[in-house]
Amino acid sequence: LGAYADSLGVSCNANDIVSATAYMSTEFNNWALYGDGTYDLSDDMRLIFGLRYTDDEVSYTHRRVNNDEYGRTGVGVRPATLDTDAAGSVDETNLSGRVGIQYDIAKGQMIYGTYSQGYKGPGFNVYYNFNPENDGRPIGAEESDAYEIGYKYASRDLLLNVAVFSTDIEGFQANNFDCSDGACITRLTNAGNVTTQGVELDFMYNATDNLTLIGGVAYTKAEIDEFNCPAEVDADACTDRSGLDVPFSPDLKYSLSAEYIMETEYGFDIYYNASYIYTDEQYSDLPGNTGEFNAASLLPDYTMVNASVGMSFKDDAFRVSLIAKNLLDESYATTYSGDNFRYQIPRDADRYFGVAFKAQF
């Protein structure tokens, strides 16, 4: 029982219903003006550039009422003294650009370098147990500076792309699980500043007229540079998270697929496809106030092996396939909720078979 109910001597039976009702809304208005272009510096060298102006307007309303006549509380239900009737808004504008150089070093081969600015607009955490004191503050905009150099190759049989990149993000917007008030929610927060660096390679190779190989590999290191302690947490109880991993950022991912087309004389082709996909381990939540990750939030690495066989018609405009997903029947989770027992398990976490139809117009 809440203190108010106690003062009245009101008892709470096991089957009593204690509830509250929340009415909430959010409105997001965005408009932008952008343009890009290419200027030929020479026959082999080009300057690429672009500019974008963005205007965001975000507003919310929230009204929550405790429905119990005695103001009693329950799991996820705050007392009547914390009923809300709040509204707020935030406006944000941004000017971001991109500039780069492309140079053709030989026929079908190009090297390039680019600098790009990124922007993600502001927002609010509006949910059932909204607390105006903390949640009424807007989530600030996220801005980034990205650098990339790379190499591209294109011929009749091979397409190859290689890139090295580094991105500095300020005001990184991240989801953080909050299990206060007896119920877990996902709270968006400006976690701080992060850096992402890595290298990527992908290719498509026509090994024969009938066999095509497609693959890629990415090594990425995403780390927290500076962490912003939540406003509701005492600064003395909040430790430095510098150097720790950014959630949902596996260090290594790679894939390889093969497809073989067998032509027939009956107006359709038969195809066989197989793929192998690997995803490294990753954390699904930000580190806690102690600067340590919850061990349960570490999602193990996993491998996916898929296969399919089918028929294609009219130059692959239509396909009918028998599919097999997760042939190794390897279970995995994609998200941890932060409450020590709840994970999000995707459909592909179990082996299954089916029929698929695809059409292109």
What are these regions (language model features)?
Residues 40, 147, 244-361:
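Conserved C-terminal beta-signal and adjacent last beta-strands/turns
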Residues 34-38, 100-104, 150-154, 202-205, ...:
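Transmembrane beta-barrel domains of outer membrane proteins
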Residues 1-23, 59-90, 124-137, 174-189, ...:
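Solvent-exposed loop segments that connect transmembrane elements
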Residues 26-168:
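Structural signature of Gram-negative outer-membrane beta-barrels, strongest in the C-terminal barrel
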Residues 43, 47, 166-168, 189-287, ...:
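Gram-negative outer-membrane beta-barrel transporters
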Residues 104, 110-120, 127, 138-206, ...:
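Membrane-embedded beta-barrel scaffold of Gram-negative outer-membrane proteins
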Residues 27-31, 91-95, 143-147, 154, ...:
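Residues that define the transmembrane beta-barrel architecture of outer-membrane proteins
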Residues 44-47, 108-111, 157-160, 210-213, ...:
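Repeated loop/turn-to-beta-strand initiation elements of outer-membrane beta-barrel proteins
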